[in-house]
Amino acid sequence: NAEGQLKGYVRSTLLRHFADSNQALFLGSANKSDLLLGFGTPEGEFEGDLQHLGDLYKTEVLEMGHFIGLPEAVLEKTPSRCRTPRATDEDELGAPWAQVDDILIQLQNQVDPQSMIDKGMDALTVHRTMRMLQDNQGHFQKIPVLPTGRNNKSIEKAREAEASSLA
């Protein structure tokens, strides 16, 4: 909705102005889940010189918040982009972030979607998440993300393949 997008634009414009006025870096707050699914706009939620949370899934950001001792009131707040009154991320996604992140992580690790469904994941949630991922493929690749340096199965498989080809 237009009013919701305007809120994101105004917020990011004010933050950009503050950062520029103070010769500071504007750190964005987009996480990997948001970026993969296009759950934001480049001029709004995805604005920033660097997305320092951009390599962490939404659920990992919450785990980090618990670890560093953020107030429970902040951590337990229902995720919402505040685009429309009382609308939550779960309403827009059709599932809680924990389920969506589980699907994204398994897809990153090249798990077959049908095997996820066969193991009990909701088929609609798996397919909806895949559609959102495919719809946004490549749209936000130019957004600078601070990598965490963690390994995933894709990287491990590539390293194993490289090692075996050298042998």
What are the residue ranges of the model-derived segments?
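ATP/NTP-dependent adenylation/nucleotidyl-transfer catalytic domains that generate, transfer
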Residues: N1-A167
